[in-house]
Amino acid sequence: MLDDRREVGLVLGSEATSTQEFRVLLHDDEYLQVDDLVVSYTDVPKAGEVATYGIVTETATVLEGASLEGDTRRATVEGTLYAEKSRTATVQTVRVLPETWVAPDSGQPVYKATGAERERALYVDEMGGGESARALPVGLSRDDEPVWVDVDFFDGTKGAHMSISGVSGVATKTSYALFFLRCLTAHPKSLGKGARNLKVLVFNVKGQDLLFLDKPNARFTEDAADAWRKLGMDPAPFDSVSFWAPALAHGASEGVPDSRARTEGVEAFRWTPREFVDERLLPFLFTDTGDSRQQITFVAERVTRQLERFACDVAGREGAIVLRDPNDAIHSDEPVVPFPGERVIESLGDLVEEIASYVEPDDAEPDPSWTSRVAPGTVSAFMRRLYGALPRVGRLVKAGPSRRIDRAREAVTVVDIHDLHEAAQRFVVGAMIAEVHGEKEGRGRFPLSVIVLDELNKYAPRDGWSPIKDTLIDIAQRGRSLGILLIGAQQSASRIDPDILGNASIKVSGRLDSAEAERSEYGWMLPSTRARARLLKPGTMVLSQPSIPAPTVLEFPYPPWATRPEEVDEAASDPFEGL
């Protein structure tokens, strides 16, 4: 053992130690705080020296010799009773080297784990080394030392996905998701081959926090910059980001994004009727989990197939279509000229009216090739849902030049949907996730695609079925092999589908409310950690990963990018940079 180790106490001998937990009697001039890492060495007969690494889960102080309540005053104020202060720390074992599972000997010195010993306690030595190092710094401990994640359990090598839970507003879930992404992009060696052409899709579902990821933060301090440097990163905003917002609803505003918080550098998006049909987006108008119980989704799938068969492009009108029976001679794979009186579909409203003429005609029976033999009430419910979607989603479908979201343009794509109705939000999320999923099918893991989705409980609730939930479950189950990595954030993990939570190798939690903290979904926490989770301040998270058998508490630094308009550092933002 090295002479410069800091001895902080002795393994307590007044009670039995175990291989899982032991207590430390602290020296008078030393201290341990919760989350500190320690190591103790035991000479085991016939096995040699065994190192036991542990994490402090609780500390305690007692006056030895005081047995009555009034003895505290007598010993400390009046001096009429002799008592001695005893300070102890409870330690949860996290690793034993070599793996000879014996309890540490009572009376053995306990040292603060620092340097290489601390890295061994956190299993960093098993996360590779040199060019193959897979240890990614993702936060700082209480003593300002890096906390690492094994990237193998995020990028699909051994596991995939991250789940972040916590109370809205104080748990800083989205902030930590972005910080984690910044760690990935700043340490390409840790990600290895996966760092090449990594694409990130982020949905801005609340406020305007994510529309300034490329702008310096005027409130960023030198102390925060030092914290970033301790993690081996240059404190700077994201350097490759594109921003997208829905196009304004009115025709006079063609191509203008509906983004009041930021106008510069934001592109407008929508789908043309041709793209709507080709990408099979109709089912994403039926994302209410109750629709599946009424066979509405069956009708939606049937109509979607028919739209693909019937759609013909219109000559001279980009993105517009007409519906013609593929069995008729007038159907063509080339752009066609509409007949007099034939409905040209240039908007979602036009499409809904044309669908109605097939599935619910005024003067005839529904076409069974469009509705099969479902009950008339189901067809009526299907059309009611379609008409109900028009005022909420209609602005997102319009003929004209293509304004699809181009995820290939930059490394990070931010899609702003916070001003849309919830039904329109689900439509956009469903369409984009399905696009990512479809692109990766059969193409191998690389390049990796990361999806960051807040309010996951809206898209993958515990109960019910929807096309979005179905796609998210498939990503959770097969994302490792597809190269699609999900970072999901939610207030309550107990409200999320178990298949999605169960497949998240990395679990993170901010502050939890008391009732939520007791749910079984947080069984990965130690009892002491659950109690503390109710008190966590913004910027403090609890991290669980398969590499380490105990949860780790970390803090992440203040972001160098702005999170609202008033934080933008205009002096540091040069509009002519690069020209």
Can you say where each PLM-predicted feature lies in the sequence?
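Conserved beta-strand position immediately N-terminal to the Walker
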Residues: M162, V415, I487
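Basic- and hydrophobic-enriched, low-structure N-terminal and domain-boundary segments
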Residues: M1-V167, S175, H187-N197, L201, ...
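Short glycine-/polar-rich loops that comprise or flank the Walker A/P-loop
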Residues: R87, G159, R196-L198, F238-V241, ...
